[in-house]
Amino acid sequence: MKNPVFTGAGVAIITPMYEDGSINFDELGRIVEDQLARGTDAIVICGTTGECSTMTDEEQLAAIKYTVDLVNHRVPVIAGAGSNDTDHGCALAAKSAACGADALLLVTPYYNKTSQAGLVAHFTAMAEAGGIPVILYNVPSRTGLNIAPETAKELSKHPLINGIKEASGNIGQVAKIAALCGDELNIYSGNDDQVVPLLSLGGKGVISVVSNVKPELVHNCCKAWFDGDTAKARALQLEMLPLCDALFCEVNPIPVKYAMNVLGWEAGECRLPLVEPSDAHKEQIEQALQAAGVIKE
């Protein structure tokens, strides 16, 4: 049995930026502190939502180190360190671990992709380079590559491969992973609209985009489930759905970064090629925030 890196709601946190595109560390610090005050169970820095794909390694490592130092062991800090180049990924994993991250979030190789055997070799090499627990990240809609349940089982045999963020949207696949891996691979939902379904299959929590705007909602949903109040967990899951729709009306993190600006945070804009949401989607986002009761009067 492997103890989970965290249990509950981990926020896939945005990276606030100044007008010139540089990282606004002061605002990142304020957002992190607000997350901790409102119940977030883990901070996931430099993931998809944090715009790691348009950061240099130096920027990514600086954001990881800043967050690790600020959080100071209050909750786990999980560092995005994925790459489609195994050698580069191993170097980034080692440097992220040296920054003090508690675990690594490693996405599947994208664009060049690989075979299932290649996934085993890639993730094994990166896990050993980092030397800290690894959460695999399966998001085939972005990468064009799916981690098959049988591959997840093979990877779960490695002592450092601790969990999987499952964002395939395929509940049947998640059930098969749970059946094959048991307690050797901790499952986290990668989709905010599937938190309770994955918890019902033995999942340990969620890596959440919605938590950026309403962390207590996602935390309380997970807590209710683990406390045995499944009716409350279900109700809170359903309460999330309008926010889920709004925050994924365009490719993540375009909507959530706009939402954070609406809420008064100095989130800034996304780096190109991501641009502002359309006017219609801005209205949808604002209406969802209003309905969720998070817009300050």
Give residue spans per PLM region.
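A general structural signal for well-ordered alpha-helical segments in protein cores
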Residues: 28, 60, 64, 89, ...
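Alpha-helical structural signal in soluble globular domains
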Residues: 62, 66-71, 95, 99, ...
